[in-house]
Amino acid sequence: LTKFWMLNYVLNERPGIELTSFFNLVYAWNTGVSFSMFNDSGATGTLLLCLMAALIVAALLWWLYREKARAVQIGLGMIIGGALGNLVDRVRLGAVFDFLDFHLGVHHWPAFNVADSFICIGAAVIILHGLFYPEKKENKEQVK
């Protein structure tokens, strides 16, 4: 919804809006993956990225189905939601619409969107859960 709103109402073909000295809303299309890697892969690349994303989402859904830890479930939900949001863009529009642009002077972080943020935050939740709440392994040896 954020991409639709930004694309159709806020930016509406404008190249960008400067909000602060370090943050802009921009009009950017990403045909590649995170941070515009593989951006020039063409129609075949787009199809392969869609298939890969669908397979990853399927694997994450299986993990989510089997997962017991609530924090990991939340993290997986965020990743799945973000991935599906970007997949819908890629299937419908042939590219993912990015609009968040953070920068320091002339040095810009690659533009991204809210779905990308959900993917990164979800991954961080899972990593932090693994670091601070490691899975306890049951001792399967019988004590004699």
Stretches found by the model and what they are:
Residues L1-K144:
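Alpha-helical transmembrane bundles and membrane-interface segments of multipass inner-membrane proteins
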